[in-house]
A protein has these predicted regions:
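Charge-rich, low-complexity N-terminal segments
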Residues: 1-123
């Protein structure tokens, strides 16, 4: 089994609805998103995925969230923009963009602080 990972960072604000504590107020993070792709074999070029293709798909999503209030971006207008929900959203959106190439994310991990992360993967 092969595994490749791509990381990217973005700055964004959010607040948590119905939360009791300081995170209920608008605040920001320098987030890191980490995308891992797994495959049982490499292609004829010797790659699981071209990092350029993965980077382009990730950049499309980063453009939507960077320097924004996440609560103003669907689905986070209705769903709390927690690290868990962000990880699931990135996973689903990357899968939608990469599936036509036969590429599917294995796991997406979101870091909202250097020591706090959440991950999403399909079983």
């Amino acid at each position: 089994m092969f595994e490749v990972t791509k990381k990217a960072t973005f700055a964004a604000a959010h607040f948590l609805r119905e939360y009791q504590g300081p995170c209920s107020r608008l605040h920001g993070h320098n987030w890191t998103v980490e995308v891992t792709i797994r495959a049982p074999k490499v292609d004829k070029m010797g790659m699981v995925v071209d990092f350029m293709d993965l980077g382009r798909a990730l950049d499309e999503l980063l453009e939507m969230v960077d320097h924004r209030n996440l609560n103003e971006i669907p689905p986070f207008t209705e769903v709390n923009p927690t690290s868990e929900n962000l990880a699931a959203w990135f996973h689903q959106e990357l899968d939608r963009r990469l599936a036509p190439q036969g590429i599917h994310p294995h796991v997406v991990r979101i870091w909202e602080m250097p020591d706090c992360s959440a991950a999403y993967w399909k079983e």
